């Protein structure tokens, strides 16, 4: 499978710092690499780029342990990641996220729906944006790395696309 070979070559790790085993490069270099992959197959480039995009919030704001855990998961080719921001009610306006996350003991309970999520059907980790404090505006928006095996998580709709059919675009709940 081309994706497994790409993972072995490190094409899924342009955003992951070298200290975590990645091939971190500057943004311009990463974009040239994605563009070159896209000449071969746009779907292929999209899977690689979306996986890197989904890791970005944890790379920016996660603890070293979180970065290590999720980076290792991706680097070892254990699965794909998806980036879930877009919602039916607010589009991709990050300041108007309707999905909520409420702390319940040691866990967070996330409620809401995301739509048009690339890799959503294949991903085993989804970066989900949710409002944790509606009174705090954009500072009350948090990103959660959610395993798709989490009870209550589901793919609710697959989009019937005219192109890019190798990977899914779907709604998640």
Predicted regions and their residues:
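Cytochrome P450 C-terminal beta-domain/meander region
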Residues: 93-111
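Short Gly/Pro-enriched turn/cap motifs at secondary-structure boundaries
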Residues: 48, 89-92, 116-119, 133-135, ...
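Internal helix-loop-helix
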Residues: 4-78, 118-125, 136-137
């Amino acid at each position: 499978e081309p994706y497994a070979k790409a993972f072995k070559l490190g094409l899924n790790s342009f955003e992951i710092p070298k200290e975590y085993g990645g091939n971190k490069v500057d943004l311009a270099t990463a974009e040239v690499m994605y563009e070159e992959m896209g000449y071969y197959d746009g779907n292929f480039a999209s899977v690689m780029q979306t996986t890197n995009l989904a890791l970005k919030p944890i790379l920016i704001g996660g603890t070293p342990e979180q970065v290590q855990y999720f980076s290792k998961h991706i680097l070892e080719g254990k699965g794909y990641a998806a980036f879930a921001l877009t919602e039916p009610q607010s589009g991709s306006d990050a300041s108007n996220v309707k999905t909520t996350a409420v702390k319940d003991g040691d866990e967070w309970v996330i409620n809401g729906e995301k739509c048009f999520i690339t890799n959503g059907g294949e991903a085993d980790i989804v970066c989900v944006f949710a409002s944790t404090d509606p009174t705090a505006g954009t500072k009350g928006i948090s990103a959660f790395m959610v395993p798709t095996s989490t009870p209550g998580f589901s793919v609710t709709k697959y989009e019937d696309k005219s192109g890019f059919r190798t990977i899914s675009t779907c709604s998640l709940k």
